[in-house]
């Protein structure tokens, strides 16, 4: 018998053809300024035309060399850094079309998880406790179901890495 967990939030049918996130031709360029008047003399193309999608229930890990734009991609998707061009559709909603109030309401549904193998995971805490902190913070699972939920998540992660 498979465990089913109902998170403490309303879930509707996918609005975007089964895609939780769709990023199309995303660009983030930062101006290079020089001189006393800080005139723009060029641009750093931190992200220059990336496209991908994530289906409901799936996970994406963005991996690359230091300085290649991974963090900028994440921050641009979340609107923490402004985009230069492209589209970001989360759960059927254009993130860049939202006003401040609606964006703030959407934020608890989106997050980046940074992974530095030398500092982000505490050797004093099991991974399940680290995940549990986020689940508890957002009130996604009732406390009485937390252990079963975390066991379920950890088993799913283990099985998905072995395939």
Give a label for each model feature.
Residues 1-163:
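ABC transporter nucleotide-binding domains
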